[in-house]
Amino acid sequence: MGDFTLEDLGDGHFALAGEMSFDTAERILQVSERPFEDHTRLEIDLSGVTLSDSAGLALLLEWVTWANHTVREIRYSGMPERVLAIAKTTEVDALLARGERWAGFIEAPDVQ
């Protein structure tokens, strides 16, 4: 089972370090619930993440969805390259960059 730390740096800033993977994503989500609730703006530094996979991407998207449903802002810094690559391949990278809600990122085609 992988290890991780989620450090509260104060004023809505957090640092996630260690594994962000199938082994840890659910636990990270559980650990983050209470400290995230206290803030309307969140900045999560991911530069300490040492291992990531598609479950890590799913975790970040879950946080974006939660933030939008609870009227909060969420931003990521230090995004792991592997997560960015998976996000680009699956065309959800804009969600991470702009914090859009799932339902709003697909635009309707132009009617002519």
Question: Which residues does each PLM region occupy?
Answer:
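STAS-like cytosolic regulatory interaction modules
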Residues: M1-S52, L61-Q112
